[in-house]
């Protein structure tokens, strides 16, 4: 399975706090404040879009208020206007609001024409989502027929984002069998409608009833459930908010637990209202007695980036070449990472602070070089972090307000006075990114990142892991076009002996290549450096800085697409290689990797979930090899293979988000996380995919008793997607979390197998049941479980609530496979009536070798459907005599009703006028 394996490639996580979310949303007396809606820089300037956003939120607020029994409404919203739009007096500079922490992103569809609203969800049921996505055409009302009013859709997506709800429809399986009946996947079950198919042939289409498959007993995939125009049922918003009568979430009383949808699968059959009721929002509010006010809006426009480096030069920075490594990382940031046009200042500190450079705008190489000369070269003195921060505020205020500015704070020392400036930090409106260097950095350091929405990173003293350079490489702007951001392609290090070589390759794909930099560092003597481009041409021109112990090559123009080859030779020292680049075009989105953990504190024995999102614009990158390297404060590392398989820690298969549980704690303290991503080489292929967490696309709607069909919904075809993917490698930088409550070795086994979330069941033959699922491990999704317990019941709630009392299946011959493997098990139900029309529910529990049990799996369902026997053929020398009568409803018109006796497939219809 490769869960724990060594890798020389490392990709640092770009840590966007998650549950740990960087979101600024907070609840204040029933009203949601701090909502950030960002307009993507690639959206053409259109002032009406701002009004459309306001209209959507204004419509959504009372709908949300009534749907939550007068408990929640939208109080204020900040709209981020792109920097490349015209400035206006009413546009203010943001404070902590950035594109990185935006809750809603308005962007052009990718691929074109796919305007489905959706929410990115990485976590479990009840865990907050990441971000809502809308397109300009959707906000302009051009998709009303497909999705319904924009305000209602916003509430549907808000429920994904804020409360971790899932959809109550299912595009992959629209119908299911229950008690011999075919039922649509819907909630509530009382929503009325018709099961029909839009049959098109020869350029014309006709609405026809769905036909039952004689083998499966279900309707064909093209069959659709079209809700009636007039409804009385009020639930549920997570099924179809577009139905006029739907104004509520499903409750325990009207929730359809049998429907095979994501809400039932991910939330253990709980209704959406039950999940909302368990949320922190619900627990700390009571219903309002008056109507809420309308939302208020602030318009914020991104301006030039303002950054001040605040760098520790205390005596402890002389340990283990820390100051030299800081200079190397600082040079990468100043020469490459920080964007053109940015303003950069620098402060150093020990027990006092020293201004090394006032704010200086990056206009070209001269400015970058000048700033590198201000980096510290001597370490001495104590540690006063607040002195450094206060000095940085002063540097910034000499030219700009501190609102929305950024401070990069690096320290390796302890400082028990850091909390004395917390209030000043909060009032400043500045975003603080923290870099903890070594094992003794101030324990409260990360609080500065948390309170301001900055990145928190940790770099150990293990130079070969390149952690400090990766941390500074992560500090690209949280705003602006992604085409301007620095992207790490490779980050690698190695300790060499006896004239050994460090050999390898770097893939420069077609989405990057501008401003490409090769950076090499060493700890003793300059190594021999050999580099060839994809055509085999040797590259010269490395700038060698022996004082800083680094060399770098800036590739002119756009680097050649293909595989670059390098060889580095040295003896008895550590080398590192970092390669960065920028997008090759402003119109072609680059492949990007961002990542996060689900918590900033890992409290043993609770696992930490590591996520990596790999996308090109709005399209997911599939079948990539993604590896996370997790380094503890004592230098030990664990390697995880992250997976996009929809099992274990991974919420959704094939969404470009790769996930895995981390359980291998070995000590308390900080852990850094690094990930390597390699893709586009051995990609598999399968059918088309659609957004899993989006509003339902209406196939059609009833109007005046007639069905009006919408165009078929656009789908992402994985075949097309993979054919366009090219080989690539990526690194992205800088995340950490803090572990606590880790016992001394030997660490006891307190981790159970993870929950099975992808159990599927189907009938095999006349009476066998075929089960498939992804194997959990001994410790969550690592190792191998000891055994499985499978139980069945004809009552779905009994199986959920009384699992141990339900009938157990004989699994003597079922031996668990290694975690992440596919399991298949076929059995014949015994000691239970299993006949035509029987609905049977199945669930699994995994148990490890010390008898720790997983949570009960999702519940799978099978319905035994025995096709009716085909009647024997009988000779029919002549047509039978039908039963007939004639009715006259309108003078002059007679309708002959003909009732034929059984003639197999013969159907006749006669109309006379």
From Swiss-Prot:
Post-translational modification: Glycosylated. The translation product is autoproteolytically cleaved by the metalloprotease domain in the endoplasmic reticulum into a N-terminal and a C-terminal products that remain physically associated with each other. The cleavage is necessary for calcium-activated chloride channel (CaCC) activation activity.
Expression triggers: Strongly up-regulated in bronchioles with recurrent airway obstruction (RAO).
Record localization: Secreted, Extracellular space
Glycosylation: residue positions: 503, 514, 770, 804, 810, 836, 885
Signal sequence segment: 1-21
Domain-related comment: The metalloprotease region is responsible for autoproteolytic processing. It can also cross-cleave other CLCA substrates.
Protein name as annotated: Calcium-activated chloride channel regulator 1
Upper classification of the organism: Eukaryota, Metazoa, Chordata, Craniata, Vertebrata
